[in-house]
UniProtKB/Swiss-Prot annotation:
Protein name: DNA polymerase IV
Organism: Citrobacter koseri (strain ATCC BAA-895 / CDC 4225-83 / SGSC4696)
Required cofactor names: Mg(2+)
Protein purpose: Poorly processive, error-prone DNA polymerase involved in untargeted mutagenesis. Copies undamaged DNA at stalled replication forks, which arise in vivo from mismatched or misaligned primer ends. These misaligned primers can be extended by PolIV. Exhibits no 3'-5' exonuclease (proofreading) activity. May be involved in translesional synthesis, in conjunction with the beta clamp from PolIII.
Disulphide linkage map: none
Pfam family, one: IMS
InterPro entries given in the database record: DNA/RNA_pol_sf, DNA_pol_Y-fam_lit_finger_sf, DNA_pol_Y-fam_little_finger, DNA_polymerase-Y, DNApol_IV, IMS_HHH_1, Rev_trsase/Diguanyl_cyclase, UmuC
Catalytic activity, reaction form: DNA(n) + a 2'-deoxyribonucleoside 5'-triphosphate = DNA(n+1) + diphosphate
Active site positions, chain numbering: E104
Site feature location: Substrate discrimination: Y13
Family membership: Belongs to the DNA polymerase type-Y family.
GO-annotated cellular components: cytosol
Quaternary assembly: Monomer.
């Protein structure tokens, strides 16, 4: 049985700012956006969250909820430096590390001899070491598989940890809402609910053949996760090459204004996901995806140096006008391709 730890730093960017400027500790602060009400919030500290300020929220809305919110532009190099230090701490306990972004990672400590092989004690020691050396807090989840470790890391935040032992898994899954499973978004969860599927236990009792017929590959993954199955290894070589968001629509759309409204709703989530990996929002390309009611899929992208909503809307409109051919649209997606790390270093050196 494997021992997987998911470590998630607590409001990481904001925590770095508060550490480096103690005057910010007790006031509501957020990273991202500006007083001109442009952009979205990348992260907010806990005083700001008490007012309802959240990641991916438009800055204008955040300022309405918390007019005295202090907005900070973000310091990518400071976050990157802290992240590298945290990664080095992980490496003291295991070589099997899969970073997901600057502020979270999976660790496989199955074969680790530290702390007598106890994943719970290893997670505790890692969190304490991070605090001692960086004055930053982290939360952790410990479980026999990756997706449960990720869910567990969110159950005792901030500055805590939660353990799901192999013996705990069946009981834990019984009442776990499907929307808590990584990869099951709000739209999918709502669609599943119309089928009477709200928890993992509901899916356990559902016919797998029907799930495969309705959802294809996603149906298989959903069924496996509901059984506690996740055979994915902690991947040391993982290098994220792209980030995307998409929405499958309950009904086909036929008007451009409807498509544009969906893009407006999707964009903040794309910006939030990109900011977790690339706070400076530098990219190689960005593009759009449309799926028509005959199930034909089309994508269009082009080279663009920085994430831009206006450019994505322009690209989407061009795709809509040139490729739709009167068909209804049932899926809208946005994506970016990340810069190759070597090319990025060369570009930065040339600035």
């Amino acid at each position: 049985m494997r021992k997987i730890i998911h470590v998630d730093m607590d409001c990481f960017y904001a925590a770095v700012e508060m550490r480096d400027n103690p005057a910010l500790r007790d006031i509501p602060i957020a990273i991202g956006g500006s007083r001109e009400r442009r952009g979205v919030i990348s992260t907010a500290n806990y005083p700001a969250r008490k007012f309802g300020v959240r990641s991916a929220m438009p800055t204008g809305m955040a300022l309405k909820l918390c007019p005295h919110l202090t907005l900070l532009p973000g310091r990518f190099e400071a976050y990157k430096e802290a992240s590298q230090h945290i990664r080095e701490i992980f490496s003291r306990y295991t070589s099997r590390i899969e970073p997901l972004s600057l502020d979270e990672a999976y660790l496989d400590v199955t074969d680790s001899t530290y702390c007598h092989g106890s994943a719970t004690l290893i997670a505790q020691e890692i969190r304490q070491t991070i605090f001692n050396e960086l004055q930053l807090t982290a939360s952790a989840g410990i479980a026999p598989v990756k997706f449960l470790a990720k869910i567990a890391s969110d159950l005792n935040k901030p500055n805590g940890q939660y353990v799901i032992t192999p013996a705990d898994v069946p009981e834990f899954l019984k009442t776990l809402p499907l929307g808590k499973i990584p990869g099951v978004g709000k739209v999918s969860a709502a669609r599943l609910e119309t089928m009477g599927l709200r928890t993992c236990e509901d899916v356990q009792k559902y016919d797998l053949a029907m799930l495969l017929k309705r959802f294809g590959k996603f149906g298989r993954v959903l069924w496996e996760r509901s059984q506690g199955i996740d055979e994915r290894d902690v991947n040391n070589e993982r290098l994220r090459k792209s980030i995307g968001v998409e929405r499958t629509l309950a009904e086909d759309i036929h008007e451009w204004a409807e498509c544009e409204a969906i893009i407006e709703r999707l964009y903040p989530e794309l910006e939030r996901r990109l900011a977790k990996v690339k706070p400076d929002l530098l990219i190689a390309r960005q593009g759009v995806k449309l799926k028509f009611n005959d199930f034909q899929l089309t994508t269009q992208e082009h080279v663009w140096p920085r994430l831009s909503k206006d450019d994505l809307i322009t690209t989407a409109r061009k795709t809509w006008n040139e490729r739709r051919g009167g068909r209804g649209v049932r899926l809208v997606g946005l994506h970016v391709t990340l810069l190759d790390p070597q090319l990025e270093r060369q570009l930065l050196l040339g600035l």
